[in-house]
Amino acid sequence: MKALALLFVLSLYLLPNPAHSKFNPIRLRPAHETASSETPVLDINGDEVRAGENYYIVSAIWGAGGGGLRLVRLDSSSNECASDVIVSRSDFDNGDPITITPADPEATVVMPSTYQTFRFNIATNKLCVNNVNWGIKHDSESGQYFVKAGEFVSDNSNQFKIEVVNDNLNAYKISYCQFGTEKCFNVGRYYDPLTRATRLALSNTPFVFVIKPTDM
């Protein structure tokens, strides 16, 4: 029954919006500026997501939705550090471990609608060890605002929030909020025809996901 309910909720996010056929980030009004909810973000087991620990962020849509998030270098001709955040094509691929750290240094669990830093926790060479924090960068060629990994300062990397899609199903989305404003935008999927990869980018339609412990 839960699976059917989740499919129904997710279908609402997949309906086309003809008024936004061109990229136009949606302005969101955050429900809470601070953690006023008593329920933390929960993983697929129903356990609290702990601050500073590693998790997989995996598409909640089985099938065409893809798997988990990975840090890759889409430009094979470049020697730069991997910086592209993609959704794995395989449902069975959980992706790379991601550390979620609240902006509040006293927080022990991750609360919805509060600022977080996302960083990949993967082995890299010494030159790329700090190029793992999430941020947003504009791509002039495609016109997209992509989620990228790099040496973002804290003010730029902790502008993400986890928002509840359905609190009974432990399904969530991510919003990105412009620093110093209340304007927030959905983080969704963008299919890049040049690289044939599905990338995370600001979008009208959110990327709906579940959170898996890395020890599963």
UniProtKB/Swiss-Prot annotation:
UniProt-recorded Gene Ontology molecular function terms? endopeptidase inhibitor activity; nutrient reservoir activity
Gene3D superfamilies per the record? 2.80.10.50
Q: Tell me which UniProt keywords the record has, alphabetically.
A: Signal, Storage protein, Vacuole
User: Which InterPro entries does the annotation name?
Assistant: Kunitz_inhibitor_STI-like_sf, Prot_inh_Kunz-lg
Point out the signal peptide segment. Answer: 1-21
Q: Where in the cell is it found?
A: Vacuole
The record, for Pfam families, names: Kunitz_legume
Which domain of life does the UniProt lineage start with? Eukaryota
| Protein's name according to its UniProt entry | Sporamin B
Report the function annotation for this chain. Answer: Major tuberous root protein.
Could you say which tissues express the protein in this record?
Accumulates specifically in tuberous roots and tubers upon tuberization. Sporamin accounts 60 to 80% of the total soluble protein of the organ.
CDD domains, per this entry? beta-trefoil_STI_SPOR (cd23368)
Q: Which GO terms describe its cellular component?
A: vacuole
Annotated family:
Belongs to the protease inhibitor I3 (leguminous Kunitz-type inhibitor) family.
